[in-house]
Design a protein with these regions (language model features):
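Short beta-strand-centered aromatic/proline hotspots
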Residues: 4, 13-22
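Epigenetic mark-reader domains in eukaryotic nuclear proteins
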Residues: 27-94
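Extended catalytic cores and adjacent scaffolds of nucleotide/polyanion-binding enzymes
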Residues: 1
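A short beta-strand micro-motif
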Residues: 4-10, 29
Length: 94
């Protein structure tokens, strides 16, 4: 069974990864590292976190593999979705 590609929001930016495991109230996600433009790869040291599903702002991403690189399709639209999510959930009321 293929692992689901997701985009996870943090306050400053978002990260693309795969859901590895579903836990009680969280999911374990292993993240890619952005190299240049639309190109990503697995970091030398595994980057994983247990996160609340509420921080997944986009599911079933289209990610293509080319040798050791991964290409995240529609990255511009994904960034726009993140900016909308971020302004709604992370912006501080002054």
């Amino acid at each position: 069974m293929a692992k689901e590609w997701v985009a996870v929001a943090y306050e400053e930016d978002f990260f693309v990864g795969q859901i590895e495991k579903k836990l009680a109230n969280k999911v374990r996600v292993t993240f890619l590292e952005q190299k240049k433009d639309i190109f990503f790869s697995w970091p030398k040291r595994k980057d994983r976190a247990d996160i609340k599903p509420a921080f997944i702002f986009c599911r079933n991403l289209e990610v293509l593999q080319e040798k050791d690189n991964y290409i995240v399709k529609h990255l511009t639209e994904l960034r726009q979705k993140f900016e909308g999510f971020s302004s709604k959930y992370f912006s501080q009321n002054n």
